[in-house]
Amino acid sequence: MTQRLKNLYTKTIVPKLTTNFNYSNMHEVPKIEKIVINRGIGDASQNQKIVESSLKELAMIAGQKGVVTRSKKAIAGFKLRQQMPVGVTVTLRGDRMYGFLDRLIHLALPRVRDFQGISSKSFDKKGNYSLGLEEQLMFPEIEYDKIDQVRGMDISIVTTAKTQEEGLALLKEFGLPFK
């Protein structure tokens, strides 16, 4: 799977973007640098089982073990003490990144109920894309019987693009289904 997206990038996307944006060098063409998958666990931070199940689910989805993110300071209003777990993060690069992107585009997103495409307005000024998913059940690795609660996640696709237009063109060429 990973080879398919790498070949698509080198053989199709690079020449197409080079002509569209008039790049003089193939190293100017934007590429995907990393994909960051983040899940906030919110009020479940007191329960260690929920933190472990989130870690396990993200490891199954991403194919790589995640890291528990902890609070930097105490906030009494949220009943939060310093160094309490507040989320789980996985950063993917290289082959695992391309494998996850392939599964996201071709398996997970088509399984979303009433899916009409993802918004093209979630780009920042540097061409990075952020996507929020409401449930983990869209990934084929997650079995419905094994989860305790439906939780969402945030996926950030970090590119080397300099503008929003370059980032949008790159991700459209990879096959992300924009509206």
From Swiss-Prot:
Keywords: Chloroplast, Plastid, Ribonucleoprotein, Ribosomal protein, RNA-binding, rRNA-binding. InterPro entries: Ribosomal_uL5, Ribosomal_uL5_bac-type, Ribosomal_uL5_C, Ribosomal_uL5_CS, Ribosomal_uL5_dom_sf, Ribosomal_uL5_N. Its main location: plastid. One of its GO terms (biological process) is translation. It is found in: Plastid, Chloroplast. GO terms for molecular function: RNA binding; rRNA binding; structural constituent of ribosome. Binds 5S rRNA, forms part of the central protuberance of the 50S subunit. Part of the 50S ribosomal subunit; contacts the 5S rRNA. This is Large ribosomal subunit protein uL5c. It comes from Chlamydomonas reinhardtii. The lineage of its organism: Eukaryota, Viridiplantae, Chlorophyta, core chlorophytes, Chlorophyceae. The gene is rpl5.
